[in-house]
Every structure is written in C-alpha cells, then in structure tokens.
C-alpha cells in the first residue's frame, strides 16, 4: 500500500468506486471530502484515489482471469489461450449441439407473402432456405455482441506539443444475452476478452444445445476471433443493421449527386433492398444508377465491394424484425457507453492502459451486480444477471 493510502471500509470503497465510474477523479474526491467533512491533511487526495482505483481494477481483472482459468481448466481447455481443441472435455451438447427450432418453410412463406403486399419487385422478399433457418424466438439462443472502443493513450512524460496521429487503447466489450438475462465482459485486448467469453459460456452452460448468434459491426478482427474460438461448433454472425445502413449512407453521400430529395430517395431504396438481405439485388440497383446521378464512381464501386465482402453476414432483417428478433448490436454499444465512453471519451481526456482498463472493469462489475461480492468476499460469481 502506497503512502497516505488508508484501509477503507466496504461502504467507503463502494461509494468511491461508484463516484469515480461517473465523475472525474477530481470531482469524485471533492464529493467524498464534502460528504465526509474532510479538509486539509485529512482530505482524500486525487492522486491517492487514482492510484487506489488502478490497484483495485488490476486486482479485479486478475480475479476475472483467475475465475476464467479455473473454469477452463475444469474442462481441460488450455487456460492460457482459452482456445478449445482436441483433448478438451466438453459435453457432446456443446460440441455438436441440437439446435433449437427454426421458423421452417411454412411460416417463412406465410410471413414473406404478408410482407410483400404492395411492394415493388426490388424490395420484395424471396423465399430461400436461409429464410426458413431463422430461429423462431422460442428456443435456446445466446446472443453475443462484440465491439472495440478506443480511448486516447496518455504517453508518459509528454514533451512539447502533442504529435499528430495519437495512439489509442482498445477496450473490447462483450455483451451476452440469454433467456432474459445478461452479462458484460471487458478486457484490453480481444484475445483476453474472448478467453473470458469462452469460460463464461461454459460456466453458464450456454454452449450446450444453444444456438450462438454473434452481432458485430463487421470488423475483420472480430470475425476472425469468433472463428478462432468457436470454429469447432455452430455459430451465426449477423452484421449490425444500423452499422450497415450508416456505412452505405456514407458511401452514397460521397458517390451520388442531385437534389436533397433525390439523394435521400436513392439511400432509402438501397436500404429497402438490403433490409431483405438480398445483396445481389442491392448491387444490381447500384449498377442501374444513371451517370447523371453519380458524382464519384469510385465510391459507388467501393460500396459494391463492401456489400460483397459483408454478404456472408447479411441476414433477412425484414423477417427477423417481423419475428421481433434482434437485428442490431446496439446492446453492446449501450454497454460500451456505460463501461467506457461515458467516463473516458470526453474531449481532452487521455488514459494510461492500467487506468482505462481499471475503470472499464469496475463499471462492468457494477453492471453485472458483482461489485459487492468482490469487495466483501473477493469473489466473482460469473453468473448471468437479470
């Protein structure tokens, strides 16, 4: 323990942690000193608070890692990497799950017929096997959203003016949802986050006869890690609808010309086609644009290439929407806001790796309802929260 760091009661520690997760260290210590009527030599110092929070966060991160490695070891999974390979003692229901019910051909055709009423040819749904393979929403599905969020890295001993091209610390946040319950994991480094995820799914038996559905913004590193850690069994990746729509609009804003209404019409028509999941129809639509509508043909080609690259992870968003199934990774984006962005991405802020990671894991632990157990018993339950 560093000089001036005092032993703290459980309630004092919890109050301190909740304050620093919402406020700057300066504001948090100011509130504490006002509440506790501490002044001058007896006051809580900002630097002392920051050092203690980083130390607490490091201990908490080690607690999550130790719990994960204990779980992995019990399944004979290599605990340093978390990658499931030959020799792992997983139940057959995890290795070769009996997947829950899908909507099937009859329901799919009925939904498509109803959806197509009054729509033009390009935006109509067309039945295929993929449509009938959508989960019906009543079976055992585990929805996993993965995202990275970068905060500015504070270099030690900065001199002179800040250089261009700042470095960033990447916090990986993973949100897990199943049967009305949820849990949030975070780590600096995607490999570390996925190791925690594998252990969490094993501990909660969420790989045993569960359909795994991943949502992401389409980043290659996320897709590659999903295959790296879950390639031994079934899984589905769905490209987040809001990200897809935003990305297409960005390309179109640079690639088309005309009146505001005309450009908006083109964006809306392309979105309507992609809503059905028919990526080739979307490419055909872009090919049909007149030269008078195109400002930058290179951007239109880049958009077509983007749609082709992401086509394996496009789904029939329209049918999923009709079935009240998820089409977006907005839950992990909300988790990102709570765990990282709300506290760490204000203008002018920069962070050390330990400082950023500490605040992120502390906030995630609060969201999961695990903070009291760690403060009082040094225990992580690793169980889903309602």
Question: Where are the model-predicted features located?
Answer:
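Catalytic center-proximal scaffold of phosphoryl-transfer enzymes
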Residues: 1-386
